[in-house]
Swiss-Prot record:
Its EC number is 3.5.4.2. It catalyses: adenine + H2O + H(+) = hypoxanthine + NH4(+). Substrate binds at residue 276. Disulfide bonds: none annotated. SUPFAM superfamilies: Metallo-dependent hydrolases (SSF51556). It is an enzyme of class 3 (hydrolase). It comes from Pseudomonas aeruginosa (strain ATCC 15692 / DSM 22644 / CIP 104116 / JCM 14847 / LMG 12228 / 1C / PRS 101 / PAO1). This is Adenine deaminase. The record marks 218 as: Important for catalytic activity. Belongs to the metallo-dependent hydrolases superfamily. Adenosine and AMP deaminases family. Adenine deaminase type 2 subfamily.
Amino acid sequence: MYEWLNALPKAELHLHLEGTLEPELLFALAERNRIALPWNDVETLRKAYAFNNLQEFLDLYYAGADVLRTEQDFYDLTWAYLQKCKAQNVVHVEPFFDPQTHTDRGIPFEVVLAGIRAALRDGEKLLGIRHGLILSFLRHLSEEQAQKTLDQALPFRDAFIAVGLDSSEVGHPPSKFQRVFDRARSEGFLTVAHAGEEGPPEYIWEALDLLKVERIDHGVRAFEDERLMRRLIDEQIPLTVCPLSNTKLCVFDDMSQHTILDMLERGVKVTVNSDDPAYFGGYVTENFHALQQSLGMTEEQARRLAQNSLDARLVK
């Protein structure tokens, strides 16, 4: 069934470009930029990927991102991801990038954006993959820093379709960023937000009611709140679910416990995505395949999940 799943046309709506940095490319960029790494070789780095929770993953993720320095680096990162998409028949992508991860290291905003945009344009022209780019704020940083990032983004407003919210969830509720999101919407941006991954269902309510998001990234803890489930079904609010990520970060102890198919059968508009595939052991097809292997996902369910991803695009 893997080949059939691979050939299924699909969109990816929850993907962090920095999270596609495979160990081989990380080492190549470190060499190109003459950066000393704390790992001796690719295999040592792969072993470091045995993290146990979101914070351990984020610590490794931000350390790895340090090799991204030049416009060419960001182009190469994005282009490598798009080639994976082509191989898996991902026909549309709406990736996140985290400018603060780079501007806080002294990399100019425009350098980051130029490399990513050039690769996305080439992906559309040469690979036929349509796209919309989402600027994501880091929630463990302050509201003031998010406002500053929005200031930096406004001269390039035509480069983005939406703003989002990611990073360490617990203790950083969506309400912390309500004013930034209000301002972003007034400037013409759509909004999305990570909520209900490690954080409680209340964070999903806040994302919907205070940030007024078009869709929820993750959202799996909605299953704990029947009233919230009813709203997601009634309003057909998409959830961009990332199964391999959820098990790797221990949101679920095992894939057999994942609720995505239960939510699908109840009428929630769930989609399948890879989140940070270099770190979580698989791109979109591998996520679909894991559901088939562990939960007995049928072809009919896979078709619905793929169609949901195409229907939930912000760029139609």
